[in-house]
Curated annotation (Swiss-Prot):
GO terms for biological process: ribosomal small subunit assembly; translation. It comes from Mycolicibacterium vanbaalenii (strain DSM 7251 / JCM 13017 / BCRC 16820 / KCTC 9966 / NRRL B-24157 / PYR-1) (Mycobacterium vanbaalenii). This is Ribosome maturation factor RimP. The keyword Cytoplasm applies. Keywords: Cytoplasm, Ribosome biogenesis.
Amino acid sequence: MAERSTGLPSQRQVVELLDGEFTRAGYDLEDVVIDAASRPPRITVVTDSDHGLDLDSVAELSRIASELLDGLDSAPYVLEVTSPGVDRPLTTEKHYRRARGRLAEITLTDGSVLTGRIGGVADGTVGVVVREGRSNLSVREIALNAIAKAVVQVEFSPPSPRELELAGVSRKEARA
C-alpha cells in the first residue's frame, strides 16, 4: 500500500539531514517524531548529550534544524527541539551513564523490581546503590541485559552524601 504524502519530510529524511550537524555540535539525535495530524503539523526532534541540554543549546539546535529543514520544499510545520524527558526509559549504556546519580525504578528480566541510585557503567553492567533496611546502603552490579525496564524517578529531597559517594557522584555534580 502506498504511503499518503503529507507534504512533510519523512522521519528518515529529517534524521539524515540533522544527525551529522547535531553530532558535530556534541549532541545525539535520539528520536524524530513527525505528527502530520496535528494542526499545524509538528516535527519534534529529541536530542541529548553527556553534558545535558540547556536553553541556549535548545535555541542553537533549533536554529540549526530550522536552517536545514527550510531547505526542503515542504508544507508548513511547527519545529520543536527537546530533551527526552525524565520519563524516558533507560535503554542504552549512554542513557545509564547520563543518569548517573539519579534514582531509578528498575525491573529485572526475572520480574523483580528494585529502586536504586544509578552509579558507574562499564562493560555492560551498571552499579546501582540500593537501600537495605533503613540505613544500610550497598552497590549491586547488574548486567544491562538483565534489565527489562528502567525509568528515572522524580525526587523531592536530596540523596544522602553516602549514597552519592557510592554512586560515584560528587555533591557538585549532584546539584548540576
